[in-house]
Amino acid sequence: MIDVTVAEAACGHLHEAAQLSRDDPNRTGALLTFGSAGQVVMTGDMHGHLGNFKKLQRFCALERSPGRSVILHELIHQEPEASDQPDLSIDLLVQVAAWKCQFPDNVFLLQSNHELAQLRGQEITKGGRSVLRDFEQGVALRYEAQAETVLAAVYEYFASLPLAARTANGVFMSHSLPDPLAFDVFDEAVFEREPTADDLAPGGSAYSLVWGRFHSADAVEYLAQRWGVEAFLIGHTPQEDGYARVGRLLILASDHAHGVFLPIDLSRKYTVDELERNIRKFVSVE
């Protein structure tokens, strides 16, 4: 693990990770694509959980597994165990950025509603607290006089993130999916371009993608047929047991002791039943 407390190093990792994200050879517009060789590991919301991140690194073992890729999203806005504890999810964010720099061909990040809200200054409250303010205070606690410089690097990083990933075997991965009521107005061309300010604002298709909820099995099936998808993997909605299934949709959570992740062999087709059976719990990782 790197020393996350050095502002210059943190900014360096964040700036480099942002550039790698923008220039990713797997990326066209706002979509990452993966072929039919190797493995992709999909995670759920992580919200500052360093323990599960360390287990993810051990499982992926990228230093000896060049054919394995890993996708992360929603890293920030940790839920403190007590009201007087700081949100230090900046630590996870910097660790993941450093991992991206170390393994640029293996580590991938997607846009999420919390990262987007922090970038846009759009308030989110949990239990009466402002998670944006708590995150900024955590950055100030960690980096003191250099906090604003680090925050600028954080926002550059958030602005660089793609929206989704798709595999040759029919798996679509994103932070969430549009609300069913927005299906008819959702602009699917958003995946083909760099997201604009309008895309990322309320009413935009990128915003709709990362904030969507209320997905029924029928709605998921409709979207699967429309987009030619075998299975959707997302996060966004909290899952106390680690995951939930809604038809072709699997919702993963990686931010607590019952958190999960999902390894996918890219060389074969999967049913959703098979994908569900492949879900791994972080507690199973030594």
Residue ranges of model-derived segments:
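Feature recognizes metal-dependent phosphohydrolase scaffolds
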Residues: 1-286
